Amino acid sequence: MVTRRHLLASASLSATLAALGITPEALAASRVKLGNAAPFNFDALIERARAMAGQPYTPPATAPADILAKIDYEAHGKIKFDTAHALFADGPGQFPVTFFHLGTFFRAPVRMHVVDKGEAREIVYDESYFDMPADSPARKLPRNSGFAGFRFQESRLGDQKKLDWKKNDWVAFLGASYFRAIGELYQYGLSARGIALDVAQAGRAEEFPNFTHVWFDTPSNEHADSVTIYALLDGPGITGAYRFVMHRGKGVVMEIDTALFLRRDIDRFGIAPASSMYWFSETAKGTATDWRPEVHDSDGLAMWTGSGERIWRPLNDPPRVMTSAFSDNNPRGFGLLQRDRDFNNYMDGVHYERRPSLWVEPLEGWGEGAVQLVEIPTDDEIHDNIVAMWVPKAPARAGSHYRLRYRLHWLADEPYPTPLARCVATRLGNGGQPGQPRPRGVRKFMVEFKGGPLEKVPFGVKPEAVLTSSRGTFSYVFTEAVPNGVPGHWRAQFDLTVDGKEPVDMRLFLRLDGKPLSETWLYQYHPFQSPVGPVAS
């Protein structure tokens, strides 16, 4: 028997639908239930967000709280979306859409819509879209309760034996304005979100506005590698309209166009925020903290400044909440990266070595401001304790509006690698000399750089370590080739003597004949006492 699926696979979608007399809208309706049609375009969505900002915030209606409370972690894990109801499972386009169910951890409903030829129809929630146990509390939810989020699945047109679209997805939106994508190594890791409001701001509770509505543009090209969605953001302090054009190729690249409107003053207005996890790495690890050598989704913040400087700032698990601001004017880009790709440095089946890097690329001038890095103490890998974002210099006041365009690159590395040598490791140890009593308050640093111009340093010539700090004094400063036989692999070594426990900010790069050979290493050192001896009195 020839099914519609067979027909769609053997001919172009437009020809098949025409032959069957089925519109794309009707095709979507065969998989999910749709509401009435209403006009839709991005300009109108922007005006809707603008009008909402002039009105008091109204929290979205949610499903009964007592039912949602029963859909706990265990119950939610037993609810699986039935891919027989996936949006665009038969096309048009190559990437079907599946949905997340509401639960105790995801209570705010997201209204989903499909757009075709300028008309939008809501996708009506129905429990029949999900496989769930007969006694699941989710069966007691009222009709049209909404969804918690959605995923784009891998291509239905690809080799299903290698990458079954029903089991593999490449982007997910779930919770508040959070979303994430896999990189080119097919692994989820850190997250992005639409906006960050008052992160770790003294005297202010952080606000988490929600994407309350999402619209899926019906693809017009059967084999296009991109999808387009629109989203409405709403919260007590902000409204916004978003357009995401998401490309699935080498990793995932998202082009984001957003209009934002403020209901109130925002003390820390975080644009293009990324959230990640860093517990420990080769840099510093407490005795017997964990059996694994390293645990992190990202190991550093990379920045490409408006003046062209390339900067690498290794991440910390600090003793207290720390916020670092790196002032800039029209930054070229920044991102939280996972540079260490060696499994042996993690030894974990969750494959931290495959976690994606996320690079933010402004598509227009962002003016004066700062890349801000928030580091929060953690004692486990289950917490996202790192936030990186752009914060404008001008105050974010009630009534202000912003129009922003930027690109997010979810890749294994930076999309525009520096030609300079890159920092590949930061190692800390006891200061002083082997075999001698170790002086108090002295820490030894070993910073490794690799590649770029270092590969052409003549034999017998040593680069200069250009080193500064906010306080303390340096000693035993020198550079040497790492004795591993790898060309262009060098390290700078030095001791830092410092009193007290206040953080020390350091800056280092390698130079030869007045020219930089490496990117700039920035580091914030939190003095600590090593649990080893002997220590000089």
Curated annotation (Swiss-Prot):
PANTHER family xref list: GLUCANS BIOSYNTHESIS PROTEIN, GLUCANS BIOSYNTHESIS PROTEIN D
Family: Belongs to the OpgD/OpgG family.
Protein name per the record: Glucans biosynthesis protein D 2
InterPro entries membership: Gal_mutarotase_sf_dom, GH-type_carb-bd, Glucan_biosyn_MdoD, Glucan_biosyn_MdoG/MdoD, Glucan_biosyn_MdoG_C, Ig-like_fold, Ig_E-set, TAT_signal
Originating species: Ralstonia nicotianae (strain ATCC BAA-1114 / GMI1000) (Ralstonia solanacearum)
Entry-linked SUPFAM superfamilies: E set domains, Galactose mutarotase-like
GO molecular function, one term: catalytic activity
Associated pathway: Glycan metabolism; osmoregulated periplasmic glucan (OPG) biosynthesis
Domain of life from the UniProt record: Bacteria
Gene3D superfamilies with a match to the protein in the record: 2.70.98.10, Immunoglobulins (2.60.40.10)
Subcellular localization(s) per the UniProt record: Periplasm
Signal peptide as annotated in the record: 1-28
Post-translational modification: Predicted to be exported by the Tat system. The position of the signal peptide cleavage has not been experimentally proven.
GO biological process, one term: beta-glucan biosynthetic process
Keywords associated with the record: Periplasm, Plasmid, Signal
Cellular component aspect of the GO annotation: outer membrane-bounded periplasmic space
Reported function: Probably involved in the control of the structural glucose backbone of osmoregulated periplasmic glucans (OPGs).
